[in-house]
Amino acid sequence: MTTNYIFVTGGVVSSLGKGIAAASLAAILEARGLKVTMMKLDPYINVDPGTMSPTQHGEVFVTEDGAETDLDLGHYERFIRTKMTKRNNFTAGRVYSDVLAKERRGDYLGATIQVIPHITNSIKERVISGAAGHDIALVEVGGTVGDIESLPFMEAIRQLAVELGRERAMFMHLTLVPYLAAAGEVKTKPTQHSVKELLSIGIQPDILVCRSDRNIPSNERKKIALFCNVQENAVISMRDVDSIYKIPQLIKAQGTDELVCKRFGITAPEADLSEWEQVIYEEANPTGEVTIGMVGKYIELPDAYKSVNEALKHAGLKNRLSVNIKYVDSQDVESRGVEVLEGLDAILVPGGFGDRGVEGKILAAQYARENKVPYLGICLGMQVALIEYARNVAKMEGAHSSEFCTETKYPVVGLITEWTDGEGKVEERTETSDLGGTMRLGSQLCHLAKGTKAYELYGSATIHERHRHRYEVNNNLRPQIEKAGLKVSGLSADKKLVEVIENPNHPWFVAAQFHPEFTSTPRDGHPLFAGFVKAAGEFQRGELEK
């Protein structure tokens, strides 16, 4: 199969939404029956985002094969059906690390290692490898044109375009077209300068996607086309919208997919966007509204919980409910008390690392249990629910996780030292293992017990969900907690690790060690989140069974 490439770059400012624009175009091309994939090239020196602070970088998105990747891969999976893998995201740090490892082995036979050709060749090899087997690959380069870090990546895609030829490669560049209220017009000069910067690297954009808070007038688009050396119909106006799921229709209405197919000589049927039309309709016509409290420690940057936020919205679509997310700092729960949780229709405690704010999360789980408020715990959210139950119901005074308190008499959560991965291999870890890439990662099989809430929601005895954690329920203390009434409703493939817990004495209290948010999509939703939001609506209306 011959693969065609669309290289996506950004200029003027960062955070323009390259990932959303690229994913939207990919969704249209997929709707035309083409096999599409996407890649994200990150210019930072970290080997992967796994050890980066969520408040700096946003969430770490985990792929099925266990790669810790950029949050843009979450957007990709929510827009297209192709599942991302470790081949769909790599960083400058990963490239340099691999090149240096080869140099140490002597693979370069004593050559002087340079950015060109060694680093650029490595980037090109990874792009070609990751795109193999698809009709079209959209390759997004992180950062902004002109950044010193992105130069090797820009050079690599320039070389690739030359090697592939015009009939197999094209460039899509996103820029900002600001509106000046004093002048009463949009300004194209930043876009012109951004393209000029791109041209200085040797790249001529074929499509310009212009971000603005309004539609860009026809005369301004003509001006951009003239000065930036692109066809007028290739200047795409991408105005601000109230939902990212409207972007595919916005791009298609301007014939962007037709431009791509014409350039690559592809004959494909018209795109069927009926699924996206349904998503937009559901989003615009809710029958009610619920407020869900997200109790976390990274709330100053909502992108730290990007997939959870989106999964809640998707669940809202499935229930025809508008979901308002109220971010609650877990430290506020500690310092101000559980009063900050009053008035919520449901409580969600997401994943996290470190002991800051943990007691606040434990209090949130206790509040939800005692007041019969719907509760969904994810990863650490399951662990704090277990700790709270052990302390206050099983009467295991001072119960805790060994991650936060090594002196506890009841370490109900402890480090996993050995487990079987998705491929059946046994993985081992110790307290002294590196932090990076040493967790239980990726999609794992889970057995659900019949007659439980989890089984009812999923409608299946076996499921696959993605993991990212080092700590698990301590099986030595598990019988004591179960005896006190907590139900273990999900177990790992080898039935040695606890994956899902429930409180049978509560109308809706479910917590999972895995991350269900990573597999939720706007078109399909996710059963766990759909059930949770439904319960929130019933709780609000006083219909939730006590």
Swiss-Prot record:
Pfam families: CTP_synth_N (PF06418), GATase (PF00117)
Signal sequence extent: none
Active site: C379, H515, E517
Residues that, per the record, bind ATP: S15, L16, G17, K18, G19, I20, D72, R239, D240, V241
GO CC annotation: cytosol
EC number, UniProt record: 6.3.4.2
Recorded catalytic activity of this chain's protein: UTP + L-glutamine + ATP + H2O = CTP + L-glutamate + ADP + phosphate + 2 H(+); L-glutamine + H2O = L-glutamate + NH4(+); UTP + NH4(+) + ATP = CTP + ADP + phosphate + 2 H(+)
Residues bound to L-glutamine: G352, L380, G381, M382, Q383, E403, R470
Cited NCBIfam families: PRK05380.1 (NF003792), PyrG (TIGR00337)
Function: Catalyzes the ATP-dependent amination of UTP to CTP with either L-glutamine or ammonia as the source of nitrogen. Regulates intracellular CTP levels through interactions with the four ribonucleotide triphosphates.
Subunit structure as annotated in this protein's UniProt entry: Homotetramer.
Full protein name: CTP synthase
Native organism: Vibrio atlanticus (strain LGP32)
Gene that this sequence comes from: pyrG
